């Protein structure tokens, strides 16, 4: 109800489809596949449990009207040498402290990292060496959640492939939906890049074995890395 005592009309959360461009980037861009990562001061380029620097798959600025996380910068990393489904480590539905570093069986540590940063400044001096840099564009749309259709998008509500999943952060807050990636998108890589294990092609990478990916994050922002990739399909 507004200040005049009238009932306000409910509006669905804003959402944006993510479109991947075709012209390779030759300079930093905040919305990109691969490219030059934008990281907060003191935030190092994430590393896998194996010690290798993780590959930047994509990054983007979330529009200001995205629920909970508007205006923040989303970055998705995964090790080029390790490719598997994510495995939420939780007791009941509550994730363990620093769940983003927890072992991911059969691995002794984490091979992925997703960051939500408030306002990272200048980009890294060197670009992501493996994933080919391409621009991303966001356009407002409405996801009808039709059968057999899943969009690469931020905001709105998750279009679960199988069934809704929910988790609580170690801090106690229920994780909120940020982004979804459809099944088996291919991220082209540069010549000479390491071949991804269990990949689709030698010249492309996939996220989490090509599963559909749903990114859920802590709305209290207890840590920039408090983002969980949930896999289905």
Q: Where are the language model's segments positioned?
A:
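Preference for intrinsically disordered or flexible, low-complexity segments
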Residues: 1-233
């Amino acid at each position: 109800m507004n200040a005049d005592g009238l009932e306000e009309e409910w509006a669905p959360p804003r959402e944006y489809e993510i479109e991947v461009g075709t012209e390779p980037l030759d300079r930093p861009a905040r919305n990109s596949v691969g490219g030059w990562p934008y990281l907060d001061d003191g935030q190092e380029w994430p590393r896998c449990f194996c010690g290798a620097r993780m590959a930047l798959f994509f990054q983007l600025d979330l529009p200001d009207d995205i629920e909970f996380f508007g205006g923040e910068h989303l970055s998705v990393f995964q090790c080029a040498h390790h490719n598997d489904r994510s495995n939420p480590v939780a007791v009941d539905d509550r994730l363990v402290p620093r769940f983003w570093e927890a072992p991911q069986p059969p691995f002794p540590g984490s091979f992925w990292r997703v960051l939500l940063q408030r306002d990272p400044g200048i980009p890294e001096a060197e670009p992501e060496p493996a994933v080919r840099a391409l621009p991303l564009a966001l356009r407002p749309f409405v996801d009808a959640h039709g059968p057999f259709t899943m969009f690469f998008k931020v905001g709105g509500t998750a279009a679960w492939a199988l069934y809704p999943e929910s988790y609580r952060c170690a801090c106690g807050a229920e994780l909120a939906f940020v982004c979804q990636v459809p099944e088996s998108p291919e991220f082209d890589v540069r010549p000479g890049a390491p071949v991804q294990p269990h990949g689709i092609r030698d010249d492309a990478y996939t996220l989490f074995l090509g599963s559909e990916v749903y990114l859920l994050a802590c709305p209290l922002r207890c840590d920039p890395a408090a983002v969980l990739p949930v896999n289905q399909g």
